[in-house]
Regions:
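Hydrophobic alpha-helical segments that form the core
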Residues: 132-155, 159-175
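Basic, helix-initiating cap at the start of DNA-binding domains
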Residues: 1-22, 26-27, 31, 185
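Short amphipathic alpha-helical segment with a characteristic S/N-K-E followed by hydrophobic residues
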Residues: 11, 26, 38, 49-54
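Hydrophobic alpha-helical connector segments
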Residues: 67-95
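Amphipathic alpha-helical packing segments from all-alpha helical-bundle domains
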Residues: 101-126, 132-147, 177
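Short hydrophobic/aromatic patch on the recognition helix
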Residues: 37-47, 145
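Conserved small/polar residues in nucleotide/adenosyl-binding loops
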Residues: 185-191
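Append "Primarily bacterial transcriptional regulators
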Residues: 11, 30-35, 43, 86
Length: 191
């Protein structure tokens, strides 16, 4: 593993440890650098600010490992794995969602919207939807799922991750059925 990645992981670990002691918005770059045993300049060599670090952690530790090979058939299992990992590191994820909410939500929305756009493309092979409609549907589902995850985290992650993922799968299945029924109605309508 390149030295740069080792340093980034050490910085990330230090930030995660600090979230057990105080809110993320109260953690300074100096706090992270001191905990990691590096100079502030070293931190800034790797990250622009603590929010870029946070996005790096979410991407490299939560999303990238769990989103690999995601498909329409397994997305709920992948979501369950993400939620389980969040629950295993509950203090970190609750802290960062509560105290860096804008940054985290924006990042989660970008990841979710891209994932849903790809899923909609696969579902709508015959191109019944216009690009504008695809974007709206993708944003609708991205905001819904991200909102549920944020509320789940803020509420203390009380519901089991698998149960929450199952609820989301059921909801999306019902939406998919509704879209199918509407498409049949649309096809059978006289013009």
């Amino acid at each position: 593993m390149p030295e740069s990645n080792l340093t980034k992981k050490a910085i990330a670990l230090s930030a995660k440890e600090l979230t057990k002691e105080k809110p993320y918005d109260k953690i300074s770059i100096s706090d992270i650098a001191d905990r990691c045993g590096i100079k502030r300049q070293t931190f800034y060599y790797h990250f622009q600010d603590k929010y870029e670090l946070l996005v790096w952690i979410y991407f490299n530790e939560l999303f990238a490992p769990n989103m690999e090979d995601i498909s329409l058939e397994n997305w709920d299992e992948k979501l369950g794995a993400i939620l389980t990992q969040m629950q295993e590191e509950k203090k970190f994820y609750i802290n960062t969602i509560k105290h860096a909410e804008d940054y985290i939500i924006q990042y989660m929305l970008e990841v979710a919207e891209q994932t849903f756009e790809e899923a909609i493309d696969k579902l709508d092979e015959k191109s019944h939807l216009k690009n504008e409609e695809r974007g709206i549907f993708a944003r609708f589902f991205a905001y819904g799922i991200c909102g549920i995850i944020v509320e789940w985290a803020k509420g203390g992650m009380k519901m089991a991750p698998e149960k929450l993922a199952d609820y989301m799968r059921e909801m999306l299945e019902k939406c998919k059925q509704a879209v199918y029924i509407l498409s049949l109605i649309h096809i059978s309508e006289p013009t």
